[in-house]
């Protein structure tokens, strides 16, 4: 992502939605609740990835994460002590940022279907987090499948 963004002429406006699949997002600001019908549709779509599902049953991940996010997501997005944002059984959390000049700015927390208000200021600066080196950049590969033929 960083290489793709670096190739854009500045200041190209960009909206970036991040989904924390391999680790939690430190600053989620979007909450998306969904029900059984949507979960069934997502599981059907996931079925197209036969090779990945042979390697690991990501169907369990989809419903397990979504159940956990339904329980924890409201407080992660809207703040500790916040009542649950939806009675639906599943949810996803995302971090949405916009590039403003050379900064990555987030808006207030909101439901996905609401979106930020039209005049909402994106005034939470997440640039330091997004420009920080990844763990892989800091310490190298940890648990990656390495190409045995690489030299």
Residue spans of the language-model regions?
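Metal-dependent de-N-acetylase/amidase catalytic core
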Residues: 1-149
């Amino acid at each position: 992502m960083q290489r793709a963004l670096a190739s854009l002429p500045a200041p190209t406006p960009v909206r970036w939605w991040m989904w924390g699949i391999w680790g939690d997002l430190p600053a989620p600001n979007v909450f998306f609740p969904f029900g059984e019908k949507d979960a069934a549709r997502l599981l059907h779509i996931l079925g197209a990835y036969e090779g990945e599902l042979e390697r690991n049953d990501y169907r369990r991940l989809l419903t397990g994460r979504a159940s956990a996010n339904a329980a924890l997501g409201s407080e992660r997005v809207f703040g500790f002590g916040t009542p649950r944002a939806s009675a639906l059984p599943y949810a996803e959390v995302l971090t949405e940022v916009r590039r403003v000049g050379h900064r990555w700015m987030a808006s207030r927390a909101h439901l996905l279907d609401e979106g930020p208000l039209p005049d909402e200021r994106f005034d939470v600066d997440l640039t330091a987090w997004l420009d920080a080196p990844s763990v892989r950049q800091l310490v190298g590969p940890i648990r990656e499948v390495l190409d045995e033929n690489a030299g």
